[in-house]
Curated annotation (Swiss-Prot):
Region (Disordered): 24-83
Role of this protein: Involved in ubiquitin-mediated protein degradation. Regulatory factor in the ubiquitin/proteasome pathway that controls the turnover of proteasome substrates. Targets proteasomes to the nucleus and facilitates the degradation of nuclear proteins.
Organism in which the protein naturally occurs: Aspergillus terreus (strain NIH 2624 / FGSC A1156)
Domain of life from the UniProt record: Eukaryota
The name this protein goes by in its record: Tethering factor for nuclear proteasome sts1
Length: 314
């Protein structure tokens, strides 16, 4: 059954759009009869004309920078587990692990000990004192909490770290003595700090427990005497005269209870010999103090500043 479908009416705005489209089509320029396709001979003539004409300005030539060659690490075709190389392995070891490894290697191969001794850098005063102060810290931390720190019980508790500190002192002190150490200033600097460590050792109520402390004073006193004699031979005893060691050693002797008196006498005899026979003849402390003050004034450049200057005939 055929049915007629009525065409829906067109909205008014569609008519307006069609009028605008017609107007745009009418404003399109028309092609003139003179416009035609270019032929091959026209292109050739135009090319010859452009080639014959000299350009007004040459284009600037900009060099092209080539990309720099990168060091690309070649990738391994096959990835598999492998141990670390020696440099990387040493980077992972701390100080204690490295020391233990070297110690075990020297025990298994005694020939390596001499090579390590000659290859390792020479210990300095600061590095040696750092080790000694670490032993001193271990000793202080081993004391029991509360109670009498000078009792026999406390001595038994700290006996092991005390022995380690005294052994370290006995081992490090000869290293800084002549002839192994040729600089008197280095030897004196070490002895000054090492004596302070001995002053800090605990004093026990039982006299028998103080034998180790007294032995440490005897050893350090002998070391002082050896260094003083060697320093007196070098440079006219300059280190002993102007380093203030007379006052420092006197203070150490006072803190030790007179256990360094032999070193004080040795230093006084060396300084008296340097000052001449007049100083030894007087023998009093006033003469030494006067000479010391004159030396200090000469070194500081203030000698004679307070003395009035005569004006006129002499």
């Amino acid at each position: 059954m055929n049915s007629l479908v009525a065409t829906p009416p067109v909205p008014p705005h569609f008519y307006e759009y069609s009028r605008l489209a017609s107007a745009r089509q009418m404003s399109t320029p028309t092609v003139t009869p003179n416009s035609r396709k270019r032929k091959a001979e026209d292109d050739t003539a135009d090319h010859d004309g452009r080639m014959s004409a000299s350009p007004t300005s040459s284009p600037a030539f900009t060099p092209r920078t080539l990309p720099s060659a990168r060091n690309v690490k070649r990738t391994r075709p096959n990835i598999s587990g492998r141990p670390l190389s020696l440099p990387r392995l040493l980077e992972t070891l701390d100080t204690d692990a490295l020391r233990g490894m070297l110690r075990s290697m020297c025990e298994r191969h005694p020939s390596l000990a001499d090579e390590i001794v000659h290859t390792a850098p020479r210990p300095s005063v600061s590095s040696a004192l750092q080790v000694l102060r670490q032993y001193q810290s271990n000793l202080q931390s081993s004391f029991p909490l509360g109670g009498n720190p000078a009792s026999d019980y406390a001595y038994n508790r700290v006996r092991q770290p005390l022995g380690q500190l005294l052994d370290a002192l006995s081992d490090f002190t000869p290293h800084f003595l002549p002839p192994n150490e040729t600089q008197p200033s280095v030897s004196l600097s070490y002895l000054d700090d090492a004596t302070e460590i001995i002053h800090a050792l605990p004093r026990w109520s039982t006299p028998q427990n103080n034998i180790e402390r007294d032995s440490a004073y005897d050893e350090i006193c002998k070391a002082w005497i050896l260094v003083i004699r060697e320093a007196a031979k070098r440079g006219g005893g300059f280190q002993l005269q102007y380093g203030g060691w007379e006052q420092k050693l006197a203070k150490h002797n006072q803190n030790s209870g007179g256990k360094l008196q032999a070193a004080v006498h040795e230093l006084a005899s060396c300084l008296g010999w340097m000052h001449g026979p007049d100083t030894q003849a007087y023998g009093g402390s006033g003469g030494n103090n006067d000479l010391g003050s004159i030396r200090e004034q000469l070194l500081s450049g203030t000698y004679g500043l307070g003395t009035p200057v005569k004006v006129g005939p002499w």
